[in-house]
Design a protein with these regions (language model features):
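Mg2+/Mn2+-dependent nuclease catalytic core
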Residues: 62-88, 92
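Solvent-exposed beta-strand sheet faces enriched in polar/charged residues
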Residues: 36, 60, 103-105
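Short acidic/glycine-enriched loop/turn segments that link adjacent beta-strands
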Residues: 39-42
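Conserved catalytic cores of phosphodiester-cleaving nucleases, focusing on short active-site segments
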Residues: 25, 44-67, 82
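Domain-level recognition of nuclease-like catalytic cores that cleave nucleotide substrates
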Residues: 92-129
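Short helix-to-loop capping/linker segments positioned immediately adjacent to catalytic or ligand/cofactor-binding
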Residues: 33-34, 91-93
């Protein structure tokens, strides 16, 4: 598979993984507020709410033989982009007083099959957690 085909497949897998993650979160009682929220060159895969908590979710779709663990797949630079976009979303939508959290949903591919492996609530914080 050439580089362009790999990128297309990765994009396709990412979109399917995000849809799967959204469905998984809905089943856990979350309301999906936004999918693929864009601000400047920043994107948040999913923004969900449950009770008084808004979670900004990064979805990572990887093959089952991937070595990288989910929390390590979101580097500090990406986290900073997420924090910036989240701040913009909160200001734009005038979200009231609520808990804000940054989560990761890890989706694994095995051949043609995909499934959610884990949902890590509070995977990282603006303060380096």
């Amino acid at each position: 598979m050439c580089g362009i085909e790999k990128k297309r497949k990765a994009r396709r897998d990412g979109a399917v993984g995000e849809a799967l993650a959204a469905e998984y979160l809905r089943k856990k009682g979350y309301e999906v507020l936004e999918a693929n929220y864009h601000h400047v060159h920043r994107e948040i895969d999913l923004i969900v709410q449950k009770d008084d908590c808004v979670a900004f979710v990064e979805v990572k779709t990887r093959s089952s033989d991937a070595i990288l663990e989910a929390p390590l797949a979101v580097g500090r630079r990406k986290q900073m982009f997420l924090f910036s976009a989240a701040s913009r979303f909160l200001a734009q939508k005038r979200v009231g007083d609520c808990e804000v959290r940054f989560d990761i949903v890890w989706v694994e591919t095995e051949g043609a099959d995909m499934h959610v492996v884990s949902h890590i609530e509070g995977a990282f914080t603006p303060f380096g957690g």
